[in-house]
């Protein structure tokens, strides 16, 4: 626990240096962590409201509300007893240099993966997933993508750095297999012939969680999986603090149940993106993101 004198701190507001007050390790490559948390304070690829650069800090700050619980409900065990997780802070890049951010993030992830670590990353806008996929594909080969979002982000018309184009480029670069990838919660215009399976928000809200999960697992098969969660997958009633909100989304409860249900998949990398705290109300968006990130760690710990 990252506190003065290594003393226990059950405060809901203090000592928010690392996510969940987990240990800080600014040189995590040679350590013995299972998962390494990295922030990417970048929002230069945003098409709507900016501010995602403040997302990692907001997620870490609100995570103090989650740090006190030992045997977390409904898991009935403490993730920290099964996984060694550290927070290495934020990727460093020159302000305004999107290419440097992309290069530095990819190199950082490649180095972590080469040393046997796994990556949980906080955005920042959703573009950050593309350099992460490049790093993971070098290590794991072509992957399946499980993608929670209001948008498919498969648009071909964007610029080089655009948070709506990553999943157009990723299949073309051979990073992911669309035939084994699924996009959950979509409720905006998209190309229907790009190979991805789209489970739109209306059907995800109307079908049972068990039914949706069964389809996801059937599509993914036994490929290694990269899990990415854009917080605008949630309805703005549950996550107003994001750059491109779209009504008609998932509840936080349904999203948590779906993430928990991915436990059996071979998830090799994860991220939570697009929290823009300037538009948040009572930190509910940041809290949703922090809780989803924690559940992602719990589905890994449950395998131990």
Swiss-Prot record:
It comes from the Bacteria. PROSITE patterns: ARGINASE_1, ARGINASE_2. Its EC number is 3.5.3.11. It catalyses: agmatine + H2O = urea + putrescine. Pathway: Amine and polyamine biosynthesis; putrescine biosynthesis via agmatine pathway; putrescine from agmatine: step 1/1. Catalyzes the formation of putrescine from agmatine. This is Agmatinase. It comes from Edwardsiella ictaluri (strain 93-146). The gene is speB.
């Amino acid at each position: 626990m990252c506190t003065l004198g290594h003393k226990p701190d059950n405060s809901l507001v203090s000592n928010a240096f690392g996510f969940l007050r987990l240990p800080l390790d600014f040189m995590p490559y040679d350590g013995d962590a299972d998962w390494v948390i990295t922030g990417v304070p970048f929002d230069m690829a945003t098409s709507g409201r900016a501010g995602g650069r403040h997302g990692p800090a907001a997620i870490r700050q609100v995570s103090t509300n989650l740090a006190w619980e030992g045997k977390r409900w409904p898991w009935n065990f403490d993730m920290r007893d099964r996984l060694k997780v550290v927070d290495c802070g934020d990727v460093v890049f020159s302000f305004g240099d999107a290419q440097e951010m992309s290069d530095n993030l990819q190199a950082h992830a490649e180095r972590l993966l080469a040393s046997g670590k796994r990556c949980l990353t906080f955005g920042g806008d959703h573009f950050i997933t593309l350099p992460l996929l490049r790093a993971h594909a070098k290590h794991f080969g072509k992957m399946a993508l499980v993608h929670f979002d209001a948008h498919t982000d498969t648009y071909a018309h964007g610029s080089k750095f655009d948070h709506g184009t990553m999943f157009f480029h990723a299949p073309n670069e051979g990073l992911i297999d669309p035939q084994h990838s699924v996009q959950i919660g979509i409720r905006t215009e998209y190309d229907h012939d790009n190979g991805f399976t789209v489970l739109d928000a209306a059907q995800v809200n109307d079908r049972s969680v068990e039914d949706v999960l069964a389809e996801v697992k059937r599509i993914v098969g036994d490929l290694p999986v990269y899990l990415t969660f854009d917080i605008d997958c949630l309805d703005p009633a549950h996550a107003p603090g994001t750059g491109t909100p779209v009504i008609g989304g998932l509840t936080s409860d349904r999203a948590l149940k779906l993430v928990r249900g991915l436990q059996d998949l071979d998830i090799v990398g994860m991220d939570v993106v697009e929290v823009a705290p300037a538009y948040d109300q009572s930190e509910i968006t940041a809290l949703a993101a922090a809780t989803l990130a924690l559940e992602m760690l719990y589905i890994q710990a449950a395998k131990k």
